[in-house]
Each structure stands twice: as C-alpha cells, then as structure tokens.
Amino acid sequence: TMRRWLGAFVALFGVVVLQYKHIVLAPISLEHVQQDLTGKVVIVTGASSGIGYETALRLATWNATVILAVRNMDKGARAQGVIQQELREKGDRCVGRVEVSHLDLASLQSVRRFANSFEKENRPLHALVLNAGGITNGLHVTEDKLEYNFQANFLGHFLLTNLLLKVLKRSTPSRVVSVSSMMHLLGRLDTDAYGEGGTDALSMRDGLVRYSDTKLMNVVFATELSARLKGTGVVSVSVHPGYVISNLDQHLPPAIKSMATLFRNMVARSTKEGAMTSIIATTHPDWETMNGRYLADDCVMELCEGAARGGWKMWQRRHSAADDDSQRQWLWNTAARLTNLTIHCMAAAQAVWD
C-alpha cells in the first residue's frame, strides 16, 4: 500500500512538473517587442554572467550599444569578447556594440565615478537595467560601513539611478528596469535593521533572508520611482525573471539543499530563458502603460501574447509594501540619507520629477 501511494505521488508530481514546464516555461513570443535598437544605448549592471549577460547579448544583437557595468573587469572583458564574436557572426547588418566599464555597487565612490564618467561622455541613455545582485552568508560590511547585500543589491542601484536621471530625462522615452525575484515576497522592510544600513541588527540573519529583504527593496524602490517619474517620459518597472538556475542553492540549510537542487533542475528556467522578462521590459513598445508595473509570468504573457497562460499566481503578485506610501517614502528617504545625495543632486532629480 505504501509503495502504491508513493508511486501515485511520484506520478502526480511528474504530471505537475510536465504541466508547469509546458504552460509556464514554454517559449515567450518576441513578435511584439522592438527588435531593432539601432541608436539605443543601454547600461546593464552585473552583465558578465547569468541573466545580465544574456540580456546584454540579446540587446546587442538587436543593434543596441550595450555597456556591461561589472565589478570584475576580467570577467567583463571575457563576456564582451564572446558577445563581439556573436555580433561578427551576424555580419554587416548587425551594428550592435558592446563596451565594458567598471562598477562596484558595494562602493558608493565607484558608483559615483561610473555615473560621472558616463555623464561626461554626453551621450544618451535609453535604458538602465538594474540587474546585478547576489547573496553572501555571514555578515560582510562594505567600505562604506554598510551591510554588503543591502548595498550591492539595492543601495548602489538607488544611487546610480539618481545620478543618471538627468541623462535618462534627456533621452526620453527611456526606462529603468529593476530585476527583483519572487523571493521578495518573503522579505520585509525592517526600519530598525536597515535604518542605519544594516549591520548589528542583521548579524543574526541568514544570507537568504537578507537577500529577500533587498529584493523587496528593489520592488518598492521601482514603484516609488515610477510615481516620481510619472509624466516625464521615463518609466520604472520591476521584473521577476522566474525560477532560474543559479548558485543560490549553496546558501540553503544542508537539510533542504539537495531537495531544492533536485526541484530546481526539474522546473527552473535557464539564464537565457530567465533574461526574457528583462528583455521584454526593456524593449516592449507600449512603454507608457508599463510604468510602475511588476512583471512576472502572467504580465509578460499579456504584453507579448495578449493573454495569460496561468501559473503559480501567489508568486506573480508583488508585495503589499510596494503599495504603501509610508513604506515607500521611508525606504527612499533612508536610501537618500545613507548615500549622502547632495542638495545639488536632489534638486536635479526633482527637476526631472517635476
């Protein structure tokens, strides 16, 4: 009897997996997105590997000029070389370009240096893809005396976006795409822990918990930014790439690590598939209606195919904190204080919002 029940469970689980892969993981149509990006300039953070690399590759093959904003310049140069080879193989009709530039989001000085350098080049910026993100176990403090995950995943992107708002405004229509995760639904905005950047109060938290918190911050920030940018020609959208094959499993407790790895291998998207949400958010022509949206599976299907396919609805909604004005304001004001945004910078940003 036990074997029969076990067999039935395995069979049922197999059917669920196959249905999920057939319905949710089926290829997304790109028929309705803009595939000729000639003259467009895009910055993709964390573009040396994973979703960021796949996003940059696709945009470059669609004739965009893509800047790989990376912490590790050696890895960035290798990614640049591979993309350039892809472009050469497409022949003279492909005019895409790829550049690599140093950006360490865990250093406020590096973020300022990158933004200042780009602004001095006096060229447009049509899309800023805030893709970089990671996870660390244990408490790591940056040179700015802030918790590493908090700064690298959220705060650095907050500062970068504010410093480039003037350029984005000059380049309208333009967009800011914040790559979040379904894990943001497990996060929370802890005013005590993150009010001073998250050090002592976060020392007892698991890395995966802190990662979820920062992914929530990405969504809340993107939503608040969309409200401030309304009517300017610059839109802000956050995206969930789906359950993507990554190295996050190594940070799980040993008791569930093997099970999570098995489940991931059965139902997870590849990084190429996971990049589709970012690519669609960056290139879909219906940019005005995208402002403030959180794009997960169903939203992407509606944009590209006119109808939702279904899926795990509970993971496709965004956290209620994104709709809470007080929490959005708290996060914005805290980030502005911790990044020491100058009066000049804030005034310039306000000019964009107004």
Q: Residue ranges of each PLM-predicted region?
A:
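Terminal signal-anchor or tail-anchor transmembrane helices
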Residues: 2-26
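Low-complexity, charge- and small-residue-enriched intrinsically disordered regions
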Residues: 23-30, 268-274, 354
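Membrane-embedded and extracytoplasmic architecture of multi-pass membrane proteins
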Residues: 101, 282, 318-320
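C-terminal helical subdomain
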Residues: 111, 263-315, 325-333, 337-338
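C-terminal lobe of the eukaryotic/viral protein kinase catalytic domain
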Residues: 253-266
